[in-house]
Curated annotation (Swiss-Prot):
Entry annotated with the keyword Plastid: no
InterPro entries: C4_dicarb_anaerob_car-like (IPR018385), DASS-Related_Transporters (IPR051679)
Protein name: Uncharacterized protein YcgA
Species for this entry: Bacillus subtilis (strain 168)
Major subcellular site: membrane
Claim: Ubl conjugation is one of the keywords in the record: no
Membrane topology field: Multi-pass membrane protein
Compartments in which it is found: Cell membrane
Family stated for the protein in its record: To E.coli YfcC and H.influenzae HI_0594.
Regions crossing the membrane: 22-42, 82-102, 124-144, 205-225, 268-288, 294-314, 316-336, 364-384, 387-407, 425-445, 452-472
Amino acid sequence: MSMPAAETQPKKKRMTFKMPDAYVLLFMIAFICAIASYIVPAGEFDRVTKGDVTTAVPGSYHSIEQSPVRLISFFTSLQDGMVGSAPIIFLILFTGGTIAILEKTGAINGLIYNVISKFRTKQLLFICIVGALFSILGTTGIVVNSVIGFIPIGLIVARSLKWDAVAGAAVIYIGCYAGFNSTILSPSPLGLSQSIAELPLFSGIGLRVVIYICFLLSSIIYIYLYTRKLKKSKDASVLGTDWFPAAGMGEAGKEEDQSVPFTVRHKLILAVAGLSLVGFLYGALKLGWSDSQMAATFIFISVLAGLIGGLAANDIAKTFITGCQSLVYGALIVGMARSISVILENGKLLDTVVNALASLLDGFSPIAGAIGMYIASALLHFLISSGSGEAVVFIPILAPLADLMGITRQVAVEAVMLGEGVVNCVNPTSGVLMAVLAASGIPYVKWLRFMVPLALIWFLIGLVFIVIGVMINWGPF
C-alpha cells in the first residue's frame, strides 16, 4: 500500500535588502531635507568676504524666519543643482571624451601592454613598474573605472609568475586605486571638491605628492610580501587551493592574443597629453586657471591626439561624444548631489546643520575635528560610493565647519578625499570593486582577508597626514 506523498510547503521568498541606486539615495536625502525645512529651525551665520573667499563668522549664528521648500521649489532645486554644477559636469564629460580618444588611438593600451610584456618575468620589478604606471593613470583620473578591462592581463601574468588571482588583480587594481585614492590631479573628485571649497584648483600639491608616494610604496611592499608568501607556500593564498576561481582566466595560451604594438605615433600622442597636463598644472598653480581652462585643455588634447593618431574628423567627433556618454552617470550625479545643498540653502538649513555640528564638536581641538571629518567621510562613502557625489554633499557642510573650528579648508577637502579613498577597495557598494572581483572570480569575503590589512595601513597613513596638515596649517586657506 503506497503512502500518500507528503505535501510540500511552498517556499517563501526571502526578502533581501538591495542597496538603492546612488540617484535614488540622493533623491531620498533631498526629499528628507525638503521635509526638514518645515520642522528644523532656520538660521544663518554672518559672513565676510576676503578676496574671492566667503567665510562664516564664528559665534554669529542666529535664527531667522522659516523658509520651507515647497513642492515646486523641490523639483526646481534638482534643475538648479544641475545648472549650478554645469562647469564641473562638462569637465567630467570632456574628461571621458578625451580618454576615449586616447584609447581609440591605441596609445594607452600600447603603453600598458608594452610595460607589462617587458617586466613580466621580473617579479619585484613588475610589481613596482606596473603598480607605479597604473597609480599615475589613477591619480590623474585617466584610468579609474576602466581598470576593470586590464584585470585579465594581471591574471595571465599571475599564472606565469606562479601567483594567485588575488595577486594578479591587486597589481593592476590596487596600483590604480593607490593613485586614485590619494589623487593629485583628478578633475573629480579633487578638482570638484576644491572648486566647492573655493580653493585654487590643485593647490596643496606638494603634500599630496608625498601622500601619494606613501600610498603607492605601502601598496607595492604589501603586494610583494604577499607574492613572496605564495612562493614559499601554496597554503599562503587567501583563495585556498583554487588559485584561479574564474574558469579560463589567466590561461597561458591567451598570452599571444594580448600583443599590442607601441609605436612612435603612440609615444607622440602620450607626450602631447603629458605636456598639455603639465602646462595646465603650471597655469593652475601660477596663473589662476580653473575648470574652464582644464576643459579647454582636454578639448585641445582630444583634437591633437586624434589627428596624430590618424583619426578622421568625424571619427574624432563620434569617439569624443561616445566617451562623454560613458561618464553621463557620474557627471549628472554631481548635479543631483548639488541639489541637496540648494535645498538646504533655500530652506535656510545649511547653517543650522553647520552650527549643530560646531556645537557638537565644541571643545574639540582642530586635530580632533579634522580626524572626525576623516572618519565621517569614510563611513559616508559606504552609502554614497560616488566620490563626486559625496564631495558635493559633504564639502558644503565641512568647508564652513572647518572655518569655525580653525581648520583650513585644504585639510577638510583632504579629509574627504582620504576618507573615501581608504574604503574604496573594501566597499561592497563600489561597482568597480564588484566588477573586478567578478572578472577575477575572487569571492568578496576572501578579498577582504587580503585587502583589510592594507586598507588599515592606508587609514593610518591618511590619519598621520591629516594631523600633519592641521599642524602646518596646510593652505592656502
